[in-house]
Curated annotation (Swiss-Prot):
Example GO BP: killing of cells of another organism
Gene behind the chain: ash1
Name of the protein in question: Hemolysin-1
NAD is among the record's keywords: no
Lineage of the organism: Bacteria, Pseudomonadati, Pseudomonadota, Gammaproteobacteria, Aeromonadales
Role summary: Bacterial hemolysins are exotoxins that attack blood cell membranes and cause cell rupture by mechanisms not clearly defined.
GO molecular function terms listed in the Swiss-Prot or TrEMBL record: hydrolase activity, acting on ester bonds; toxin activity
Length: 572
């Protein structure tokens, strides 16, 4: 079978591997990660609004596996902000924009914005869903899984340690990110652009990794402690000395897969009435309890002053690891010495005569697409990894940021959050080309003042077609986004990422917010702490009219005139 079938089944069962399942098109597979993420948040906030109290909730009788610390009494301001910024998305019913953003963020980890059913430029090319967002060795820690070369029981220790370290990194990055909104692709059975809170979107990365550390397809946990501790870590591409993640789409559809959070037999409980604790598998319910701790920790963290937040975030992340992602190194290094701990997916290391299969036998069930779109059946693990690496390189060469959005990138998948194909046919990289490592965030938040009277540019409403003036109701914060060639910039609204510092028709030339980056690229030309703004399309300068209190882009602008000079400051 394919590593991940791009078939009608995978269209319905959006991401069958590398995660608790995500919602599938048409509701064929219900929410998985999304349910854990939204419900844990709403339980912490006491804000559930779609489901009723479940009288058969197993947690009522539990003594372990429950959240340890959901105290948010020190985070009143952050909680108030979360509750005030509502979101009425009908699919997830998140109630809050922060919750919605985290849901989209955790989905991104699996999907990378890819349309799973149609993620190709053409069929004569690589499978970029696999090659970019699922299979690279260096992103396995985002799913709390082994790399292909994490062999033996020590490989489980190394992968668990890397997963813990990556979790801390994601938690801190989310807490310390610039406060702004960004546009991202939300992939799956279909794909669509959406805008999200940047901090909580990045928090979704930490949420995803954290929740994946509970999936029985990713790790071994035990009911003896109600799944609180990690015993071993599984693999996906026939790693020796490890149990393997299942490759069956059918197991997702009938709920027998460990990645499905719902009990077998509950598929007929459709609609919101089926989303209840008594329908959840025990380990998934523990994952939801742990996610409550995660949400509370992040709310507390976001309430801390930015100058002290990084240290606080690191401490909170470590506490979460100690409570929910810990393992006994000695136990893990000897876990598979007991053959009763090996299931029928276990791949033996060389010289092991006990229970399990050889890597060659495991590899016989795998296939993948190469860069030309041909299905190959590799005989060795290395051959498969080489095919995937080559396809990844080919895919990345064909991806670029949408104009005006090159500031926000995923440095792990190494693609922009708002990306596009460079062409409608595959472009071929030369033999020496390698994708450069993208920076996480190259945008700078700026404010602009007119030079003559030192008045800040403002706007009456952060909406399309509103003129940018002085003395209006709302301050205007802009993200300075690198443009083509690195010498010019787009100026995008910090608070509405679809809007750009642009102009009306050339006859009038009034500067305004506009819902397109087209012809809205500017050079920012310095001189003695003041600047000129030169539009690269018209080669004209932005100037200020004190009578109308507005800014304009016409031939009247001149770099030497005081009216064409601007004071630009960066926000901390």
């Amino acid at each position: 079978m394919n590593i991940k079938k791009l078939s009608l089944c995978i269209f319905f069962a959006t991401t069958q591997v590398h995660a608790f399942t995500q919602w599938g098109a048409g509701g064929i597979t219900p929410m998985g990660h999304e349910w854990l993420t939204r419900t844990s948040a709403l339980e912490v906030l006491n804000a559930e609004h779609k489901t009723s109290v479940d009288p058969n909730d197993p947690r009522n009788t539990w003594t372990s596996g429950l959240a340890k610390n959901i105290d948010i009494s020190t985070a009143d301001d952050e909680v108030a902000k979360i509750k005030s910024h509502t979101n009425d998305n009908s699919l997830y019913a998140p109630r809050s924009d922060a919750v919605y953003s985290a849901i989209v963020g955790q989905r991104w980890v699996d999907l990378g914005g890819m349309n799973v059913a149609n993620n190709l430029i053409s069929q004569t090319g690589p499978d970029c869903f696999d090659a970019v967002s699922q299979e690279p060795a260096d992103i396995q820690q985002d799913h709390f899984m082994r790399r292909y070369d994490d062999n033996g029981q020590q490989g489980g220790v190394k992968s668990a340690q890397r997963g813990q370290e990556r979790f801390i990194t994601h938690f801190i990055n989310a807490a310390m990110a610039t406060n702004k909104r960004i546009v991202v692709w939300d992939g799956g059975g279909s794909s669509a652009k959406t805008d999200v809170d940047y901090n909580y979107f990045l928090f979704g990365r930490a949420v995803h990794l954290f929740q994946d550390s509970f999936s029985p397809e990713h790790v071994v946990r035990s009911p003896s402690d109600n799944y609180e501790k990690v015993r071993q870590v599984k693999a996906y591409i026939c790693t020796e000395g490890a149990e393997q993640h299942a490759h069956s789409t059918g197991a997702v559809l009938d709920y027998t897969s460990g990645d499905v959070i719902w009990k077998v037999g509950t598929k007929t409980d459709t609609g919101w009435g089926g989303y209840k604790a008594s329908n959840m598998k025990p380990v998934a319910l523990v994952a939801m309890e742990a996610s409550k701790d995660l949400w509370a920790a992040f709310m507390r963290t976001m309430s801390v002053d930015i100058n002290e937040r990084e240290k606080y975030a690191r401490n909170e992340a470590q506490v979460l690891i100690d409570k929910w992602m810990s393992f006994d190194k000695d136990e893990m290094e000897h876990w598979y010495d007991n053959e009763n701990n090996r299931d029928n997916t276990y791949v033996k290391v060389d010289g092991d005569t006990g229970k399990g299969k050889l890597q060659k036998e495991c590899m016989s069930g795998l296939s993948a697409k190469n860069r030309y779109g041909a299905t190959i059946k590799p005989k060795t693990q290395k051959e498969l990894v080489d095919v995937l690496d080559d396809s990844r390189r080919y895919c990345l060469f064909n991806i670029e940021a949408e104009p005006g959005y090159a500031d926000a990138n995923d440095p792990y998948l190494n693609i922009p959050f708002n990306w596009r194909w460079k062409s409608n046919s595959w472009l071929v990289p030369n033999a020496s080309w390698q994708q450069k490592q993208l920076d996480r965030d190259t945008g700078k938040i700026i404010k602009i003042k007119e030079f003559t009277n030192n008045q800040e540019l403002t706007v009456d409403s952060i909406e399309n077609n509103y003129s940018i003036v002085t003395g209006a109701k709302k301050p205007l914060s802009l993200v300075r986004v690198p443009g083509d060639g690195g010498k010019s910039f787009y100026l995008r609204s910090k608070d509405n990422p679809y809007l750009f510092f642009s102009y009306s028709d050339k006859k009038n030339g009034r500067i305004k917010l506009w819902h397109s980056p087209n012809q809205a690229e500017f050079e920012i030309l310095p001189g003695n702490n003041i600047f000129n703004l030169k539009n690269t399309y018209w080669n004209q300068y932005v100037w200020y009219d004190k009578n109308s209190k507005g800014a304009y882009l016409t031939e009247k602008g001149s770099p030497d005139n005081a009216s064409s000079k601007w004071i630009i400051s960066e926000e901390n």
